[in-house]
């Protein structure tokens, strides 16, 4: 019962889509209506509003971190922590508050990994940054980071059958699956690069960010 309740709370936390909330609060178009139509920081950046993109990134990462931190803070067993990690991630992917139309989970997964272990989170984030810097593809960076996250986990904690390690692996698999469309576009040379600004219809109010 304790695990079920913790997972439910984590799912509800994950269901808060900061891309949609921040965009609405700042008078911007719904990120599900333009660009990749993905409610995530990269797509919000395509609106031209850097501040909104940063707030989205921080918010999505924070909710992942918060859910796992709370589970650890209240002394829940590793099985519960693993369930919480998966639940908050699934909440972002399929948010009950937004008709189950969520993002791809990159920032939320990063927050979860930071809460599991700071070194694990930072190593994975650094992997994303390196790939993104050299290739300018957010999706490619996410895919590479997703592949390396379980490997970093094994390097740090060994090959023990810790439930949290399985949660990390499950998140990586889900993240790759959520990027299946991006994989097709990458192979076809049609994927948008970081900084590309796609037309976003303003939903009342001007956008106050600069074009990259």
UniProtKB/Swiss-Prot annotation:
The keyword Transferase applies. It is found in: Cell inner membrane. Keywords: Cell inner membrane, Cell membrane, Lipid biosynthesis, Lipid metabolism, Membrane, Phospholipid biosynthesis, Phospholipid metabolism, Transferase, Transmembrane, Transmembrane helix. One of its GO terms (biological process) is phospholipid biosynthetic process. Its EC number is 2.3.1.275. The chain crosses the membrane at residues 3-23, 78-98, 115-135, 155-177. It holds the Pfam family G3P_acyltransf. It is an enzyme of class 2 (transferase). Pathway: Lipid metabolism; phospholipid metabolism. InterPro entries: G3P_acylTferase_PlsY. Catalyzes the transfer of an acyl group from acyl-phosphate (acyl-PO(4)) to glycerol-3-phosphate (G3P) to form lysophosphatidic acid (LPA). This enzyme utilizes acyl-phosphate as fatty acyl donor, but not acyl-CoA or acyl-ACP. HAMAP family: PlsY (MF_01043). Belongs to the PlsY family. Probably interacts with PlsX. This is Glycerol-3-phosphate acyltransferase. It comes from Burkholderia ambifaria (strain ATCC BAA-244 / DSM 16087 / CCUG 44356 / LMG 19182 / AMMD) (Burkholderia cepacia (strain AMMD)). The gene is plsY.
């Amino acid at each position: 019962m304790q695990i079920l309740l913790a997972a439910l709370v984590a799912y509800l936390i994950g269901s808060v889509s900061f891309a949609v909330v921040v965009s609405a609060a700042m008078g911007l178009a719904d990120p599900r209506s333009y660009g990749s139509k993905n409610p995530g920081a990269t797509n919000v950046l395509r609106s031209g509003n850097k501040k909104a993109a940063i707030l989205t990134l921080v918010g999505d990462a924070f909710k992942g971190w918060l859910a796992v931190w709370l589970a650890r803070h209240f002394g829940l067993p590793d099985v519960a922590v693993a369930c919480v990690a998966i639940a908050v991630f699934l909440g972002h992917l399929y948010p009950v508050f937004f008709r189950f139309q969520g993002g791809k989970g990159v920032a939320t997964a990063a927050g979860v990994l930071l809460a599991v272990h700071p070194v694990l989170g930072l190593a994975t984030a650094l992997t994303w940054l390196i790939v993104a810097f050299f290739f300018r593809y957010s999706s490619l960076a996410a895919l590479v980071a997703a592949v390396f996250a379980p490997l970093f986990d094994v390097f740090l904690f060994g090959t023990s059958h810790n439930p949290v390690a399985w949660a990390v692996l499950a998140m990586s698999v889900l993240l790759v699956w959520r990027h299946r469309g991006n994989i097709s576009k990458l192979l076809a040379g049609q994927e948008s690069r970081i900084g590309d600004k796609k037309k976003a219809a303003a939903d009342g109010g001007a956008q106050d960010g600069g074009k990259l």
